[in-house]
Regions:
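Electrostatic, structured charged patches in enzyme active sites and in nucleic-acid/phosphate-binding
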Residues: 1-101
Length: 101
């Protein structure tokens, strides 16, 4: 089952952004986490497409986050790069690289 640890809501330029975060241990690239990450990313991509199609001004941004990326995550949140989807945690990079090997 998928139970995000926290949500952050930000209103900007008439759009409600919902940042959905699941916190994991550093380097926890288990098969279970690979599957959760893959399906959660797809779920939120599909949801965002449906919201756009229905002209609903909401967007969901999903991240797996671990302690070694906390500082960078909050810096990207503070300066707006997170809303532009320019952030990827170390754990996400590891999950993606191992997923495509």
């Amino acid at each position: 089952s998928f139970n995000p640890d926290f949500f952050i809501k930000i209103e900007e330029n008439g759009i409600s952004y919902y940042i959905v975060v699941e916190v994991k241990s550093d380097n926890d690239a288990s098969d279970d986490n690979k599957a959760k990450f893959k399906y959660a990313r797809q779920h939120f991509q599909d949801l965002n497409k449906e919201l756009a199609r229905e002209k609903i001004k909401q967007k969901y941004i999903f991240h797996f986050l671990s302690p070694n990326s906390f500082t960078e995550f909050f810096q990207y949140l503070k300066d707006g790069r997170l809303l532009k989807e320019q952030f990827s945690s170390e754990l996400e990079s590891k999950l993606l690289s191992e997923d495509y090997e």
